[in-house]
C-alpha cells in the first residue's frame, strides 16, 4: 500500500456492497472510521442508524427520529479493518456475517423474518 | 448451434418483454391522433432503451454490479436515496398500471368483475413466480408476448401507403402542446427504465460474465430493434384505422380492435393474448425491479434464485409492492390514467438512474477494455441530453395538456 | 424572485385547464360532438365484428358497456351545461345524438352474440355518426 492508497480506497470503499466469506450479501459500507495522522481506515461502519449522517444537514434531525438512536452492536456495527479480505466490485470479509452481527435483517432469527409465511 | 439457439431465445425474450401497457396506450393514441407522424419518436425511444440496456448489461456482466449498486456508489447515499425514492414511486405506479391493465384484458376475455380479476391476477403472478425458475418466468412471458406479432400482420394486411409510413420516421416538431406531450409519452413509454433495471439484475442472477457480452449486445440491439417494430406496428395500425374516423382509443380494449377488423375472432384473441402476456410480464418485471432496487441500495441479500428463505427481506418487499399496487388499482383510478402518469414520471426520474451507469460504463478503472468506445460514449451522452430535455418538459406538458385530455 | 416566478407559472398551469368553464361555448360543443362521432365510429367497428361473427361475444359486450357509459356521460354533460342561445338548437341535437348512441351501445351489449342485431346496430351507428359529423360541420361552418 502506498501513501496515495488510503484516499483511493476511501473513494472505492464508501457505499460498496459487503459480502461475507460465503458470498452472502450483508450490508453496505455506510461510513468509514479513520484514525491517526496521516489518517488510516481502521474500520467499516454498517447499519441503518448511520443513514442520517449521510443526509444533508437539514434532514438529519428528521432522519434520526425515523431511524432511532444509534445503538452500537445492533443498528450500527463496527467491522474492524482486519476483517477485510479483499476489495474488488464488493468488499469481501474474512468471517461469516452472523459472527460479525451483519445481515441480521435477513437472518432467520430476526423477529420479522420469523413471522414470514415461508419460514 | 447451442450457442445460436441460446442467443435466439434471449433475443425472443427481449422482444416479447419490450412492450408493456405504456406502449399499448401511448402508441395507439399517438397513431389515432397523428397517424404515422410520431413513428420517429418510437424509433428515438427504442434506440435509447437499447443504448441504456446494453450499457447496464455490460456493466453487470463485467463488474457484477446491478444498477442500484452503481447508483449508490456513484451518487452516494443522499442523492442515491432521491433516485431510489423516485424510482420506487414510479415502479409502484407502473406495477399498478400493469396489474390494472392485466385485469382489464381479463375482463374482455372472460366478462366478470374488474376487481375480482385484479386480485386473481396478483395471485396468479405470485404463483407463477413461486413455481417457475427465473429464466422460465422471463421466457414464458417473453414468448407469449410474441403473439403481438399479429399487429405486424395487421399492418401488412391493411397495406397502408408505405411512403406515408416511411415519412413518419422523419422527425418533426410542432408548436401544439398536445403533439409535444405525445412525443414525450411515446419516447418515454419505450424508455421505461424498470425493464433495464430488471434485466441487468437478472443477468447477475443468471451468472453472466464477460463471456456473456456478445449475448448482451445481441439481446439489446436485435431484441429491442424487433421490439421497436412491434411498437411501430401499434402506431401504424391505429393510424390507419382510427385516425381517419377520429376514434380516441381511451381504453385498452380498443388497442385490440384493429386485429379484429383484419383477422376476425382469431386476430382479436391473438391480440388480447399477446397484450395479456406483455402486460403480465411487465407487472412481474416492474415489481421485481422495485424490490431489486431497494435491496441493492440497502445492501440486503437479493435474488429470485436465492429463494425466499435466503433473501427474506427482498421477497417480502416484492410482495409488499405487489400488494400496494393491488390497493392502488382497487382505489378505482382508471389504469390507463395510472399508465400515463407512470410513463411521464418515469422519464422525469430517468436521468438520475441513467447518469451513474453512463459514468461507470465509460470508466476504465471499473470496465477495463470493456469501457464505452467512441460510438457507445457518443450515443450514451447524446441520449443523456435527450433524456434530460424530456425530463424537464415532461411535467409542464402533462399539466398544460391535462394529461393528454386536451 | 425565482420562486415567485415558478409559483406564478405553476398557478397559471393549474388554472389553464379550468379556464373554459361556465357557458357551453360553440368550441366545447363542437369537441363534445366530435367525441360522439368517434364513439359511434368505434361502435360501428365493434358491431361489424358482431355482424360478421368475427369477434368474441364477451369482448363486444364489455366494450359496448364501456363505450356506452362514455356516451351516456357525454349526454349528461351536454344536457346539464348551460348553452349560449346561439347554439341552443345544436346543443339539443347533440344531446339527442348522444342519447341514441347510448341506446345503440346498450342494444349491442344485450345482443353481443347476435349477428342479425349486430348488423342493425352497425347500420344505425353509421347513421348516428353521419348525424354527428353533419352537426360538426354546422358548428364549425357557421363559426366566424
Give the label of every model feature segment:
Chain C
Residues 1-21:
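Sec-dependent bacterial lipoprotein signal peptides
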Residues 16-33:
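C-terminal region of N-terminal signal peptides and the immediate post-cleavage residues
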Residues 28-106, 121-138:
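Alpha-helical segments in soluble extracytoplasmic regions
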Residues 108-122:
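Amphipathic, charged alpha-helical scaffolds that flank and support histidine-based chemistry
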Residues 142-144:
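Short, solvent-exposed mixed-charge patches
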Amino acid at each position: 500500500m502506498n501513501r496515495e492508497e488510503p484516499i483511493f480506497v476511501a473513494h472505492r470503499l464508501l457505499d460498496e456492497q459487503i459480502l461475507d466469506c460465503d458470498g452472502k450479501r450483508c450490508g453496505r459500507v455506510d461510513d468509514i472510521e479513520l484514525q491517526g495522522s496521516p489518517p488510516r481506515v481502521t474500520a467499516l461502519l454498517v447499519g441503518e442508524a448511520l443513514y442520517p449522517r449521510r443526509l444533508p444537514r437539514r434532514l438529519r434531525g428528521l432522519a434520526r427520529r425515523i431511524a432511532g438512536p444509534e445503538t452500537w452492536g445492533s443498528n450500527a456495527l463496527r467491522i474492524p479493518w482486519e476483517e477485510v479480505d479483499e476489495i474488488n466490485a464488493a468488499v469481501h470479509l474474512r468471517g461469516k456475517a452472523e459472527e460479525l452481527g451483519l445481515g441480521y435483517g435477513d437472518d432467520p432469527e430476526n423477529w420479522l423474518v420469523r413471522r414470514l409465511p415461508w419460514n | 448451434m447451442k450457442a445460436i439457439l441460446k442467443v435466439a431465445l434471449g433475443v425472443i425474450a427481449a422482444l416479447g418483454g419490450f412492450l408493456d401497457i405504456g406502449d399499448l396506450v401511448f402508441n395507439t393514441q399517438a397513431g389515432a391522433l397523428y397517424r404515422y407522424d410520431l413513428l420517429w419518436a418510437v424509433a428515438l425511444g427504442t434506440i435509447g432503451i437499447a443504448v441504456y440496456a446494453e450499457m447496464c448489461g455490460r456493466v453487470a456482466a463485467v463488474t457484477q454490479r446491478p444498477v442500484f449498486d452503481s447508483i449508490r456508489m456513484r451518487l452516494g447515499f443522499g442523492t442515491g436515496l432521491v433516485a431510489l425514492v423516485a424510482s420506487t414511486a414510479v415502479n409502484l405506479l407502473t406495477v399498478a398500471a400493469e396489474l390494472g391493465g392485466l385485469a382489464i384484458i381479463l375482463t374482455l376475455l372472460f366478462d366478470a368483475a374488474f376487481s375480482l380479476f385484479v386480485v386473481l391476477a396478483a395471485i396468479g403472478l405470485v404463483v407463477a413466480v413461486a413455481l417457475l425458475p427465473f429464466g422460465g418466468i422471463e421466457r414464458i412471458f417473453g414468448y407469449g408476448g410474441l403473439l403481438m406479432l399479429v399487429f405486424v400482420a395487421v399492418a401488412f394486411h391493411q397495406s397502408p401507403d408505405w411512403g406515408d409510413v416511411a415519412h413518419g420516421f422523419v422527425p418533426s416538431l410542432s408548436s401544439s402542446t398536445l403533439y409535444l406531450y405525445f412525443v414525450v409519452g411515446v419516447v418515454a413509454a419505450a424508455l421505461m427504465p424498470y425493464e433495464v433495471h430488471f434485466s441487468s439484475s437478472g443477468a447477475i442472477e443468471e451468472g453472466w460474465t464477460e463471456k456473456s457480452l456478445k449475448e448482451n449486445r445481441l439481446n439489446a440491439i436485435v431484441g429491442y430493434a424487433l421490439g421497436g417494430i412491434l411498437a411501430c406496428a401499434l402506431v401504424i395500425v391505429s393510424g390507419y384505422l382510427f385516425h381517419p374516423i377520429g376514434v380516441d382509443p381511451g381504453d385498452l380494449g380498443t388497442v385490440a380492435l384493429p386485429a379484429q377488423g383484419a383477422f376476425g375472432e382469431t386476430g382479436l384473441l391473438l391480440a388480447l393474448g399477446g397484450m395479456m402476456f406483455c402486460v403480465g410480464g411487465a407487472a412481474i418485471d416492474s415489481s421485481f425491479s422495485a424490490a431489486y432496487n431497494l435491496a441493492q441500495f440497502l445492501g440486503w441479500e437479493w435474488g429470485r434464485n436465492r429463494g425466499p428463505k435466503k433473501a427474506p427481506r427482498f421477497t417480502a418487499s416484492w410482495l409488499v409492492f405487489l400488494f400496494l399496487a393491488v390497493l392502488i388499482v382497487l382505489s378505482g383510478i382508471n389504469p390507463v390514467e395510472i399508465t400515463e402518469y407512470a410513463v411521464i414520471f418515469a422519464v422525469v426520474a430517468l436521468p438520475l438512474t441513467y447518469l451513474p451507469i453512463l459514468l461507470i460504463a465509460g470508466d476504465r478503472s471499473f470496465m477495463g477494455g470493456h469501457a464505452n468506445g467512441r460510438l457507445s460514449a457518443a450515443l450514451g451522452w447524446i441520449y443523456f441530453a435527450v433524456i434530460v430535455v424530456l425530463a424537464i418538459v415532461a411535467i409542464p406538458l402533462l399539466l398544460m395538456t391535462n394529461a393528454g385530455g386536451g | 424572485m425565482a420562486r415567485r416566478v415558478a409559483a406564478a407559472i405553476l398557478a397559471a398551469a393549474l388554472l389553464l385547464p379550468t379556464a373554459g368553464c361556465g357557458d357551453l361555448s360553440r368550441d366545447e360543443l363542437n369537441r363534445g360532438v366530435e367525441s360522439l362521432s368517434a364513439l359511434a365510429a368505434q361502435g360501428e367497428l365493434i358491431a361489424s365484428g358482431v355482424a360478421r361473427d368475427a369477434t368474441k361475444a364477451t369482448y363486444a359486450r364489455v366494450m359496448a358497456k364501456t363505450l356506452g357509459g362514455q356516451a351516456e356521460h357525454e349526454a349528461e354533460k351536454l344536457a346539464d351545461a348551460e348553452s349560449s342561445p346561439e347554439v341552443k338548437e345544436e346543443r339539443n341535437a347533440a344531446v339527442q345524438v348522444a342519447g341514441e348512441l347510448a341506446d345503440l351501445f346498450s342494444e349491442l351489449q344485450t345482443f353481443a352474440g347476435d349477428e342479425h342485431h349486430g348488423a342493425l346496430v352497425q347500420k344505425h351507428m353509421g347513421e348516428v355518426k353521419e348525424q354527428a359529423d353533419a352537426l360538426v360541420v354546422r358548428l364549425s361552418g357557421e363559426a366566424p
